[in-house]
Amino acid sequence: MTLQTDDFAPAPARRVVSAAPASPQEQAIERALRPKLLQEYVGQVKAREQLEIFIGAARQRGEALDHVLLFGPPGLGKTTLSHIIAAELGVNLRQTSGPVLEKPKDLAALLTNLENRDVLFIDEIHRLSPVVEEILYPALEDYQIDIMIGEGPAARSIKLDLQPFTLVGATTRAGMLTNPLRDRFGIVARLEFYSAQELARIVKRSAGLLGVPMDDAGGLEIARRSRGTPRIANRLLRRVRDYTQVKADGHITKDIAERALAMLDVDPEGLDVMDRKLLEAVIHRFDGGPVGLDNIAASIGEETGTIEDVIEPYLIQQGFLQRTPRGRIATQAAFRHLGIAAAPGAQAPGLFAV
């Protein structure tokens, strides 16, 4: 007899279409596929053009680039851009994240070790603690930090000069940044979801680096189901590569991509089992809505935070779900996609339709 307690409950399976940060093994693969320079970077045309100008000007003057804030959904290339910025400037990159910097001394140790014009990348910068953020303000404005020496009545503050540097902050939740911190970034770039055509170019480049022969149609099929996100596109490419290696001749065609992605339960709109489960619950159990988030969570056995932060955003962006003051409503597009008699009220087509 097998006994199982909550302490040893299996972790939930990772969704193949999740844009969440990758596992360590996947991060290593991502680094190998990452473009190194702006000319290799696909998509984000506006942000790329702005950075080309600002980086070029800073390089010509021999100055540190203004501090850069990159924000947008996960998996769109914020970390990649931070590496590219450092490479284009020809300087070192130091990388950390907001939750890691628990105390002022953690940040001070990083800042005092930066060389002239170096880049400091802080991921999840919205999660900096207030006390650490206070230390950062004078560092960003004046390249100085105040640190406390000693304790009690003998404690005193000393000012340390820093080398001019560039902070690149990345966040998926720009609204959670405090106004004082946001105002200290001279360059702000929003990263948008990619079109299927842009993702097809990324998939083609990645396939070449992985040594996988692939038709353009096969690459486009992977791109169409990648939810506008390069991280997902590269993950699906690797899974399709595995499929064709075992089930076919190693060459990715449109037919092979379709069969592999069907096996992974990723449909032509990029929806997986969990997406469809949510839509079906709203339609079948709650007559299409409106229905509250707590009721949806109870009906599909997921936490409200997971639904709100992980599942819902893509369904809303694609026009399958509508968030209203009275609750969630399944749109006509959702009824059509699931092959159910459509409810009244047409919605706009999805963002990534080809």
UniProtKB/Swiss-Prot annotation:
It catalyses: ATP + H2O = ADP + phosphate + H(+). DNA binds at residues 323, 328. Keywords: ATP-binding, Cytoplasm, DNA damage, DNA recombination, DNA repair, DNA-binding, Hydrolase, Nucleotide-binding. Signal peptide: none annotated. SMART domains: AAA. GO terms for cellular component: cytoplasm; Holliday junction resolvase complex. InterPro entries: AAA+_ATPase, AAA_lid_4, DNA_helicase_Holl-junc_RuvB, P-loop_NTPase, RuvB-like_N, RuvB_C, WH-like_DNA-bd_sf, WH_DNA-bd_sf. It comes from the Bacteria. Mg(2+) binds at residue 79. The RuvA-RuvB-RuvC complex processes Holliday junction (HJ) DNA during genetic recombination and DNA repair, while the RuvA-RuvB complex plays an important role in the rescue of blocked DNA replication forks via replication fork reversal (RFR). RuvA specifically binds to HJ cruciform DNA, conferring on it an open structure. The RuvB hexamer acts as an ATP-dependent pump, pulling dsDNA into and through the RuvAB complex. RuvB forms 2 homohexamers on either side of HJ DNA bound by 1 or 2 RuvA tetramers; 4 subunits per hexamer contact DNA at a time. Has 3 domains, the large (RuvB-L) and small ATPase (RuvB-S) domains and the C-terminal head (RuvB-H) domain. The head domain binds DNA, while the ATPase domains jointly bind ATP, ADP or are empty depending on the state of the subunit in the translocation cycle. During a single DNA translocation step the structure of each domain remains the same, but their relative positions change. NCBIfam families: PRK00080.1 (NF000868), ruvB (TIGR00635). This is Holliday junction branch migration complex subunit RuvB. It comes from Verminephrobacter eiseniae (strain EF01-2). The gene is ruvB.
